[in-house]
């Protein structure tokens, strides 16, 4: 098992100019991370306007990680394979393929892409709609799976984006692709977005997990936070609403309302031998929150 972090943790520092991606890599190494995960936030591995691969950025990031001795574990990309217009859907698949090219250029063996990131308002996020749109998701995944396979990259799908956050939905999606080599990026916190118990969901999903996203949330009643409700406002430090009408906000690991101790006990007892990647998205300064969260993750792991 390897502990590490997602560069996503330090996105605010990159957006505000306090850190470069190379500083983020140094930070991860200095804080004992065995691996680092990248997301394309403030990191234009693929130009968002032209959709062209930024080969020089990919190469320099890969070389920096090699020079400091830290592994790049995965690359995670939001995507919506359920666009109603066929042409738009085709363009979205081609956009994801460019990110797969970036993953290959970074030297990666695995990559996560979404199928329906934040595109289903709560009133349409139903069981009926899930099964109605399942064939479209599978069609897109199969095309992208062929593309990743040619580059010897393992596809992982995550309980992310609200439409497939529940354990039953994400497992059904993975199983329905027909590919045994499609694995899961298991996010221990994202089950909360659909009001599912994280401990029970983690137990169910662990056999499929290739990589685990470790995070914590504060969980509150909606009535206790008047005026704070906003669908999908998952920015760091923001309250956002769950499917069942509760409110969530990212916290420092171990300081929120998730039972992180029991979650990590379950993971450790399972013999999981993959990657655990911290995702800090609280309102504290990101450098401080990430540092404390990494220390908490190790301290809890050693004690469970």
Please tell me what each predicted stretch does.
Residues 1-17:
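Boundary/entry segment of secreted carbohydrate-active catalytic domains
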Residues 8-12, 39-41, 77-80, 116-118, ...:
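Active-site beta-loop-alpha junctions enriched in small/polar residues
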Residues 37-61, 115-121:
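Glycine-rich, proline-tolerant flexible connector loops at the mouths of alpha/beta enzymes
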């Amino acid at each position: 098992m390897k502990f590490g972090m997602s560069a996503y943790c330090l996105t605010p520092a990159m957006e505000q100019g306090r850190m470069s991606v190379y500083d983020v890599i140094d930070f991860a190494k200095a804080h004992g991370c065995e691996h680092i995960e990248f997301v394309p936030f403030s990191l234009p591995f693929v130009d968002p306007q032209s959709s062209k691969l930024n080969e020089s950025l990919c190469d320099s990031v890969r070389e920096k990680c090699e020079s400091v001795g830290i592994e790049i574990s995965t690359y995670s990309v939001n995507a919506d394979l359920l666009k109603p217009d066929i042409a738009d859907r085709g363009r979205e698949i081609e956009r994801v393929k460019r990110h797969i090219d970036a993953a290959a250029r970074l030297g990666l063996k695995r990559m996560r892409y979404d199928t329906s990131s934040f595109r289903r308002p709560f009133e349409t996020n139903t069981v009926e709609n899930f099964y109605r749109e399942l064939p479209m998701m599978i069609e897109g995944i199969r095309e992208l799976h062929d593309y990743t396979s040619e580059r010897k990259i393992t596809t992982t799908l995550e309980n992310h984006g609200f439409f497939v956050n529940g354990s039953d939905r994400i497992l059904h999606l993975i199983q329905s692709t027909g590919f045994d080599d499609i694995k899961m990026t298991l996010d221990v916190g994202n089950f909360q977005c659909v009001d599912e118990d994280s401990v029970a969901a983690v137990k169910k999903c662990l056999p499929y997990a290739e990589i685990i996203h470790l995070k914590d949330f504060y969980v509150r009643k909606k009535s206790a936070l008047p005026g704070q409700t906003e669908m999908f406002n998952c920015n760091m430090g923001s309250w956002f609403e769950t499917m069942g009408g509760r409110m969530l906000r990212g916290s420092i690991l171990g300081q929120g309302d998730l039972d992180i101790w029991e979650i990590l006990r379950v993971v450790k007892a399972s013999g999981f031998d993959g990657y655990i990647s911290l995702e800090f998205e609280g309102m504290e300064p990101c450098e401080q929150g990430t540092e404390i969260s990494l220390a908490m993750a190790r301290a809890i792991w050693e004690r469970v």
